[in-house]
Every structure is written in C-alpha cells, then in structure tokens.
Amino acid sequence: MRVLRVTFLWALLLLVAFSASVYAAEDEPKTPESTSSANPRDNDPVIQEIRGLRNSGMKLNDAKDFKGAIAKLRGAITLLHDRVFGEGREAITDPSDISQDAALYAQILNDYGTVLIRAKQYDEAIEVLEDSVAMVEKIYGDSHPSLGLSLRSLADAYMAKEEYKMAIKKYKTLRKHVKKGLETTHEAYIEASLRIAEGYKKLGNTKKNLKVLKDAVEAQNGEINGLTTGIAELYMELSTAHVAVGEIDDALRAAEVASAIFRQRDGEDTLSFAFSLNALAGVKMRQKKVDEAIKLLEQAHRIAVQIYGEKDPITQASAKTLREVKEYKLDLQAQKDEL
C-alpha cells in the first residue's frame, strides 16, 4: 500500500503541474474591448472612460494586481450604474444605446466577479455574479452565449468557496444551457460535466461522481473526438472514478483511452501524456501487474526528465516512485523465494 500511495502522490504532483498549464489560458491577457468609433456612442466620453477603466482593470488582473484591478472595475461599474439605473439614464434616448449600456454593465459585472474570485473575495463575487446572470437573462433571454459565461463564473465562485452543492446546481444549469445551444459533444458540455463530477467528488459521493462521468461519455453518442477539449480529461477522471468504487477493469479501459488521446492530441513528450502513463501505471498496480507498471513509470519518468531536468521536484518524485515500485517487485520476489 505504501507503493500505491506514492504512485498516486506523484500522479497528484503531475496533476497540479498539468492543471497549471491547462488553466494558464485563464490568466493570459484578455483582449481589450474595442474602442472603435463606428457609431456616436463610441465617442461618448462616459463610455470611453468606462471602457478605459475596464481595460486598465483587466490588465491589472492579468498582472495579478487584484487590488488595483478591483478599484478600476469598481470605478467603471459606478459610472455605468449611474448611466443604466441612475440620473445619467435620462440623457440616453436611443433605445439601442440603452440596450448596449445594459449589456456592457452585465459584461463588466462578470469581469469584476472573476477578479473577485481570483482575489478570494468569494461572497462579493457571488453577489456580483448573481446580478450578472440576472441581467443577462433579462437582456438576452436564456439562449445567449453571454448567459453561459456568467453562469460559469458564478458556479466557479461557489466551487472556490467550497459550497459544492450550490456549485453543482449552477453547473447543471450551465450544462442544460449548453446542451440546448451547442449539444452534448461540445467542449463546454464536457467541461460542465467534469465540474459537476468534481463537485460530487468533493462531497465524497463516489457513485454520483461516477454516474456523471459515465453519462457524459455516453452523451458523445459512441464517438471519441480526441481533438475536442476535455475528452481526454473526461476519460482520465472516469478511470479514477472507477478505481474509487473498485471497478479496476473498467478503470483500465478508461485510462488506456485517455492515454491514447493525450498522446494523439498533445504528443509523446508532454506532461499530459506522462501524467496519463503514471495514472495507467497506478491501475496496473491495482491489478498486481507490477512489471507493466514499471515500464509505464519508466516512460513517464523519461518524459519528466526531458521536460524538467533531473532536479525538479516533479522529476525527483517520479524517480522515487519508480525506485519504490522496483523495490516492491524485489520484495515480492523475495517472498516467493522464501516459500
């Protein structure tokens, strides 16, 4: 059992590093909102100031200056709130301007909410994002992409606050919205399913965790499009869920599919593929197929060395895992020899 714990410890280390690379896209600089002067509204000094504050705030967010970002976005929201709900509204007579102001307000609320999440100010983030969702529904109805964006941010806020039941509820609403507009094979549907499953996993509900993942796989209608973002991760999580309930053969099949997709999608010399090999080795260990596990761990370790070098903590952890599994094999052999 000591070897199994170490094997999965390295899997966790790889997962942390892999997750950092996957979610790094969320931290990349956002494209500033266009300030094109295609219509008179774009030349409105208040709108220009609001956009300037918003863009400055998001740049500070990208630089991880959350305090500064919050201040800028609050400034934008204050100006826009007056224009949408306050005295400033009286000066707006064009119906299209009124609609665009409301849409911009909902967008900036969502931006503000995501910054608050990163700043770990979850209570205010939830309050702001609930308002954003309500505004988007009022403006666009329940079939607009903006609603999905706001719902996702709101669900993420509940998840970050560790209110998993509410997070699951919001992710389910998001998934229903995605299914209606984009169908079940879209990456957004898969991502929502993964987050729902994660919520159940956090709650310790292994059966519902497994069911959500199995249903998401079945929703792909028998097709495996390895290029769809999230498919490989879906099968990897499915393997882990099967292990959690003792369904090792099913876990092996899912892990093999995941590894094949990672290899095709990302290449052989990537962290994601190394992680999948390590997870596959963990399943092999549960099957007592130690030699096969060692081969997989050796391949994963070579990839880790190539990416990080010999001294990185991830590489050292993989080396330790490999060494201990080999020692475990020797112990087994010694026990057989004593019989």
From Swiss-Prot:
Keywords annotated in UniProt: Host cytoplasm, Host nucleus, Repeat, Secreted, Signal, TPR repeat, Virulence
Q: Which Pfam families match?
A: TPR_10 (PF13374), TPR_12 (PF13424)
* Main localization of the protein described in the UniProt heading: secreted
Q: Which gene encodes it?
A: SFI4
Tell me which family the UniProt entry assigns to this protein: Belongs to the RxLR effector family.
This chain belongs to the protein called RxLR effector protein SFI4
As for subcellular location, the record says: Secreted; Host nucleus; Host cytoplasm
Membrane-traversing stretches? none
Q: Which organism is it from?
A: Phytophthora infestans (strain T30-4) (Potato late blight agent)
Q: Where is this motif: RxLR-dEER?
A: 51-74
Q: Which SMART domains match?
A: TPR (SM00028)
What note about domains is in the entry?
A: The RxLR-dEER motif acts to carry the protein into the host cell cytoplasm through binding to cell surface phosphatidylinositol-3-phosphate.
Alphabetized PANTHER family for the sequence: TETRATRICOPEPTIDE REPEAT PROTEIN (AFU_ORTHOLOGUE AFUA_6G03870)
The GO cellular component terms are: extracellular region; host cell cytoplasm; host cell nucleus
Whereabouts are the TPR repeats? 106-139, 190-223, 232-265, 274-307
Q: Name the lineage.
A: Eukaryota, Sar, Stramenopiles, Oomycota, Peronosporales
Briefly, what is this protein's role? Effector that suppresses flg22-induced post-translational MAP kinase activation in tomato but not in Arabidopsis. The perception of highly conserved pathogen- or microbe-associated molecular patterns (PAMPs/MAMPs), such as flg22, triggers converging signaling pathways recruiting MAP kinase cascades and inducing transcriptional re-programming, yielding a generic antimicrobial response.
Signal sequence coordinates = 1-24
Instruction: Name which cysteines form disulfide bonds.
Output: none
Top-level taxon? Eukaryota
